[in-house]
Amino acid sequence: MMNPLIIKLGGVLLDSEEALERLFSALVNYRESHQRPLVIVHGGGCVVDELMKGLNLPVKKKNGLRVTPADQIDIITGALAGTANKTLLAWAKKHQIAAVGLFLGDGDSVKVTQLDEELGHVGLAQPGSPKLINSLLENGYLPVVSSIGVTDEGQLMNVNADQAATALAATLGADLILLSDVSGILDGKGQRIAEMTAAKAEQLIEQGIITDGMIVKVNAALDAARTLGRPVDIASWRYAEQLPALFNGMPMGTRILA
């Protein structure tokens, strides 16, 4: 089996029918013409934010990571492993793709520990066992994995989806594409940066050009590139016609170098 490609979905993609239609059409085209197995990893920040707003619960973030108190982890699990995951499975079904919905704890695919007590139920993801997902891929399934994990003590944890995708890529020896709302990392003039090294990222963070959630994304991509020993792409889902080329390894956004 060829080494898999993990496509991490994020941003408002899950909220946009047009975007999901474009993405799944591109996935169908890719799967028809390529043998390479695909895995989707997703968060669902926008789904969670909407739910929190509806329930009048505050959304707190620390260094770009969502603070998840004990009384909110069940709600967030429902939103990510439930609503967001099953929405993607429904789109797969609509496009005749045989998909399986998972969370990080299934088959111990990604090991999760608590990241920081101050963040509450927020997990640190580390590589786990490839057995379950490899067996699904060998049988032609598309695994769709939510970024909810579970500790060895049985505590549910909310994991940053970029970091979850990185850990799963390390588990499977997979290539990784982080799809988001932006077409890559932008410089101070709003121009896309084609390639990024750790030194350049540090410089842009110091200058305040890379901020908030993008810091988490860039650090996750740098961590992934280092861990995997291969480049990681950050790109946009907005340009559907470019997606098959992107899945083929053509750089379309910002390529993060190890």
UniProtKB/Swiss-Prot annotation:
Residues the record lists as binding ATP: D181, V182, S183, G184, I185, L186, I209, I210, T211
GO cellular component: cytoplasm
Catalytic activity: N-acetyl-L-glutamate + ATP = N-acetyl-L-glutamyl 5-phosphate + ADP
Pfam families in UniProt: AA_kinase
GO MF term set: acetylglutamate kinase activity; ATP binding
EC number annotated for this UniProt entry: 2.7.2.8
Compartments reported by the entry: Cytoplasm
Keywords: Amino-acid biosynthesis, Arginine biosynthesis, ATP-binding, Cytoplasm, Kinase, Nucleotide-binding, Transferase
GO biological process, one term: L-arginine biosynthetic process
Highest rank taxon of the organism: Bacteria
Homology family: Belongs to the acetylglutamate kinase family. ArgB subfamily.
Protein name, as recorded: Acetylglutamate kinase
